[in-house]
Amino acid sequence: MVPGTSSLTQDLVRAINGEYSAIACYAKLAEKAPNQEIRKQILEIRQDEVRHYHIFSQIFSEITGTKPNPQITEECPTAYRVALKFAFQDEQHTVDFYLDVAEKTQDPFIKEQFKRAAADEQNHAVWFLWFLRV
């Protein structure tokens, strides 16, 4: 195992589980959206999370030689507005986490993937904040 991959592997497991949880949550959130415009945007955000999940899973498999075993680590609130606030806060925390991972890794590809995902997550947070005002 390459030095530093144990920490990276743990970070990838956390990222994979977070994306997996968000995918499930945003599907439920989209069903509760008050209109088609918001529903469509939430589903677009969900697609970004699916993409992140696949990228992080691929990196995990390349490093460990195994497939990840994703788990839902955070339950999605059932009330629409509570779930929006939860999603906003989660996206903000995820931005910080992904930027930390990008800073720690020496691998340019992995660094770039986490930076791109962090930028997406920041964009998602802005959308969820906007949805809270509608």
What label would you give each PLM region?
Residues 1-134:
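Non-heme di-metal
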